[in-house]
Amino acid sequence: MKVLILACRVALALAREKEEFKTAGEALESISSSEESITHINKQKIEKFKIEEQQQTEDEQQDKIYTFPQPQSLVYSHTEPIPYPILPQNFLPPLQPAVMVPFLQPKVMDVPKTKETIIPKRKEMPLLQSPVVPFTESQSLTLTDLENLHLPLPLLQSLMYQIPQPVPQTPMIPPQSLLSLSQFKVLPVPQQMVPYPQRAMPVQAVLPFQEPVPDPVRGLHPVPQPLVPVIA
């Protein structure tokens, strides 16, 4: 009986040892696999980090080559979104009673009475009557006077049939307008009437009836020939 008990104990102990070895081997395998996975993960992380560094350096180089100013958005730390209620589409605001605004009447300002401007009256100067030259009758030449002038026959005939024309009476100075005090005083200048000019005798009518007279200095000069015989 003791031997059986010892054999059972030894078998149990061996079985336990085998189980322990199995568990230890499994643990070692799991640890080794975990280590391998950890190393693999670390390698992947290192590769990713290297790739990111390369991309960052390339991006920096491109930014240095192409530099464009970009507008920076202003960010305020103290600002917060304003909450507002979301109203339904069929929502209508409440009706408010109509308020009557008082009608403002414009104030009528009293217009100050302006003083009437007193205009000084202008003193009228008396009219200066212009003296009128009395009409002098034109003296008509008689036949005896014409004969004494020793004029040619055609000229005498034209003078005999010529009717003497009276000279129209005109005032010496036209009426002057009223002069104000602000204007300068102008003294009237007396004007003499110009007599009516008589018709001049043409030279061509006189030349045929003149005879040349010898002159030692100037030469020959025509002398009028008498038409009427002179009574001695």
Curated annotation (Swiss-Prot):
Tissue/organ expression: Mammary gland specific. Secreted in milk.
Species name: Camelus dromedarius (Dromedary)
Name of the gene this protein is made from: CSN2
Family to which the UniProt record says this protein belongs: Belongs to the beta-casein family.
GO cellular component, one term: extracellular space
InterPro entries membership: Casein (IPR001588), Casein_beta (IPR016345)
Keywords, comma-separated and alphabetical: Milk protein, Phosphoprotein, Secreted, Signal
Pfam families per the UniProt record, alphabetical: Casein
Biological role stated in the UniProt entry: Important role in determination of the surface properties of the casein micelles.
Location(s), subcellular: Secreted
Designated name of the protein: Beta-casein
Span of the signal peptide: 1-15
Residues modified to Phosphoserine: 30, 32-34
